[in-house]
Amino acid sequence: MGFKPFLEGGIAAIIAGALTHPLDLIKVRMQLQGEHSFSLDQNPNPNLSLDHNLPVKPYRPVFALDSLIGSISLLPLHIHAPSSSTRSVMTPFAVGAHIVKTEGPAALFSGVSATILRQMLYSATRMGIYDFLKRRWTDQLTGNFPLVTKITAGLIAGAVGSVVGNPADVAMVRMQADGSLPLNRRRNYKSVVDAIDRIARQEGVSSLWRGSWLTVNRAMIVTASQLATYDHVKEILVAGGRGTPGGIGTHVAASFAAGIVAAVASNPIDVVKTRMMNADKEIYGGPLDCAVKMVAEEGPMALYKGLVPTATRQGPFTMILFLTLEQVRGLLKDVKF
C-alpha cells in the first residue's frame, strides 16, 4: 500500500473542505434547529448590531414539514417544538445572512481548523484505502471494476476513515454550532486542538468518539455513494464516447452526480449524527432514540433538515475534491514514494 494515494486524497480534501466550509456550517445550524439546546436568540452576539425591525425566523429548511404528532409524553426527554405560528421557512442563504449579521462574517468559518484536521485524517484515509482496494480488486486482464465491488470498497474505506477522523468531527460540529448557543452555554474553543483537549478532559476521552457508530455508518454511505458513483459515471461517459478519461467535462459531470447521490443518501443519518455530537452529555439513548424523538417532535422530514445546504455543499465539495484530485495525480504521477 503506497503513501501517495493518501497524500493525493488528503490534499484534494483539505482544499475542498476549506472552500466549502461555510456551506457545511449552514447545514449544521439548520440540522440543529428544533433541538432543545439550539438558540434562536435574535442577537446572540451583543457586540454586533441587529435591526430589530426585521423579524428573525427559525432555521427551517424548505423541505421541513410541521409535525402532526406533537409532544410525546412517553419519551424520557420532553422537547416542545415551537408552535406553528412561529414556524416559517428560512432558506440556506437567509441562514448564512443571519449568521453574518449577528455573529460577523468570520463566523462562517467557525471550526475551519477542525475541518482541515478532519480532512487530513478522515478523507486522506478513506481515499487512500479506496484506491488501494480498487487496485487490488480490478481485473488485471479486462480492467473491470464492477459497481458492487466499488460500493464494497467504499464501505470499507469509509468505515476505517471515520474511526480515524471522529475526534476532529466532534470538534468540528461543536465549533460550528457554538454561535447558535446562548452566551452562557457557548464553549468558545480557541482552536481544534483546544476543543479536542477540553472535550477529553471535561467529558472523557471516550466522548471524542461520541456518535462514532453514526459517523461510521454515514462515512460508509458517503464514501460508497461518492467514490463509486464518480468512478462509475466516469466509466459510462468514457465508454459511451461522451468524454475522455482526462477531460475536465468528464470530471465535472461525474463529480456533480456523485455529490448529489451522496447528499441524498447520507442526509438522514447526518442529521442524527450532528444532534448527538453537539450534545454536551448523553441526552439520547442512542441513534434510534434520537431519530424517534426528532420524528415525534418535528415530523418525519426533520431527517432531511439541511438537505438543501447539504446538496449545495456536497455538489461543490465533490466537484472541487475530484477536480483537484485529478490535477494532483497528474502533478505527482512521476513521483515515487
UniProtKB/Swiss-Prot annotation:
Its membrane topology: Multi-pass membrane protein
Keyword Nucleotidyltransferase among record annotations: no
Keyword Isomerase (UniProt): no
Highest taxon listed in the record's lineage: Eukaryota
Each Solcar repeat, start to end: 4-136, 145-236, 246-331
PROSITE patterns xrefs: SOLCAR (PS50920)
Role summary: PUMPS are mitochondrial transporter proteins that create proton leaks across the inner mitochondrial membrane, thus uncoupling oxidative phosphorylation. This leads to a decrease in the efficiency of oxidative phosphorylation and an increase in heat production. May be involved in protecting plant cells against oxidative stress damage. Recombinant PUMP6, reconstituted into liposomes, transports a wide range of dicarboxylic acids including malate, oxaloacetate and succinate as well as phosphate, sulfate and thiosulfate.
Name used for this protein in its record: Mitochondrial uncoupling protein 6
Source organism (scientific name): Arabidopsis thaliana (Mouse-ear cress)
Gene that encodes the chain: PUMP6
